[in-house]
UniProtKB/Swiss-Prot annotation:
GO MF terms, alphabetically ordered: lipid binding; peptidoglycan binding
Protein name in UniProt: Major outer membrane lipoprotein Lpp
Principal location class: membrane
Location of N6-murein peptidoglycan lysine modifications: 77
Lipid attachment points (N-palmitoyl cysteine): 20
Source species of the chain: Serratia marcescens
Function: A highly abundant outer membrane lipoprotein that controls the distance between the inner and outer membranes. The only protein known to be covalently linked to the peptidoglycan network (PGN). Also non-covalently binds the PGN. The link between the cell outer membrane and PGN contributes to maintenance of the structural and functional integrity of the cell envelope, and maintains the correct distance between the PGN and the outer membrane.
Region (Disordered): 56-77
Biological processes, Gene Ontology terms: lipid modification; periplasmic space organization
Coiled-coil ranges from the UniProt annotation: 26-74
Residues annotated as signal peptide: 1-19
Transcription regulation in keyword set: no
PANTHER family for the chain: MAJOR OUTER MEMBRANE LIPOPROTEIN LPP, MAJOR OUTER MEMBRANE PROLIPOPROTEIN LPP
Entry similarity comment: Belongs to the Lpp family.
Length: 77
């Protein structure tokens, strides 16, 4: 009887320990997901900021090309 209680107690304790271990892993994974979400948000913000910089560079290049075209046209006259 005592041996059965001891074995049963060991099984319960073992399964409880495994449950705590799983919860710790789940908590760690949840923390990792939150960290990755924060990084994705930061990268998304960086990409959006770069889009406006790229558009400004394209606009500057277009204006420079237009000036060069105007100068080339003036030399041909």
């Amino acid at each position: 009887m005592n041996r059965t209680k001891l074995v049963l107690g060991a099984v319960i304790l073992g399964s409880h320990s495994a449950g705590c271990s799983s919860n710790a892993k789940i908590d760690q994974l949840s923390s990792d997901v939150q960290t990755l979400n924060a990084k994705v948000d930061q990268l998304s913000n960086d990409v959006n900021a770069m889009r406006s910089d790229v558009q400004a560079a394209k606009d500057d290049a277009a204006r420079a090309n237009q000036r060069l075209d105007n100068q080339a046209h003036a030399y041909k006259k």
